């Protein structure tokens, strides 16, 4: 990684506050260490999806589980702002879906645009892994019907960034 450009950092939070680690094996029949919410820290702000695209100097609504430096970007902030405006309608309260359009999917779109990399599969694929369990199959259709109401952060309109939560399978 060169020293030029902005660092692209994935910030990972645990929406379960540790409960997934202690209860998932018994409940799901598989070990899930966290229920991840992600945001991307770049240009001095954290960009996340919660009811819409949001950004803040530092999110801080819950303790951070880990930070993953995914690379550097040479994309100017102005071009990134155009990207955000271009995807804003894809990431709204109405389009939120626990399994297919959550904070982790938004973060993935952002890091692909900025650095040409992806969010780690252990985060991005967690909903599919949970849906493969008997309990996941029982609950996911009900959760999917609830749509945007399932955004665990209960975010409202847009700010300008990425990442938003999703109980059971990530943000």
Please place each PLM-identified region on the residue numbering.
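Non-catalytic ligand/cofactor/substrate-binding and regulatory segments of enzyme domains
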Residues: 1-101, 114, 130, 134-156
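Short conserved catalytic/interaction loops centered on acidic-Pro-aromatic/His motifs
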Residues: 114-126
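Intrinsically disordered, low-complexity regions enriched in glycine and serine
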Residues: 155-171
């Amino acid at each position: 990684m060169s020293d030029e450009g902005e660092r692209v950092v994935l910030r990972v939070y645990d929406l379960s506050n540790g409960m997934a680690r202690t209860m998932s094996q018994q409940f799901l029949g598989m070990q899930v260490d966290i229920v991840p919410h992600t945001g991307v820290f770049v240009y001095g702000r954290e960009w996340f999806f919660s009811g819409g695209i949001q950004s803040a100097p530092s999110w801080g609504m819950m303790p951070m589980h880990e930070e993953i430096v995914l690379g550097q970007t040479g994309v100017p902030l102005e071009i990134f702002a155009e990207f955000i405006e271009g995807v804003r309608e894809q990431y709204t309260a109405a389009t939120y879906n626990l399994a297919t359009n959550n904070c982790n999917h938004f973060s993935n779109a952002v890091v692909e645009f900025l650095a040409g990399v992806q969010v780690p599969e252990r985060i991005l694929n967690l909903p599919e892994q949970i849906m493969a369990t008997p309990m996941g199959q029982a609950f996911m259709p009900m959760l999917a019907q609830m749509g945007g109401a399932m955004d665990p952060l209960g975010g409202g309109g847009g700010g300008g960034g990425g990442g938003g939560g999703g109980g059971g399978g990530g943000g």
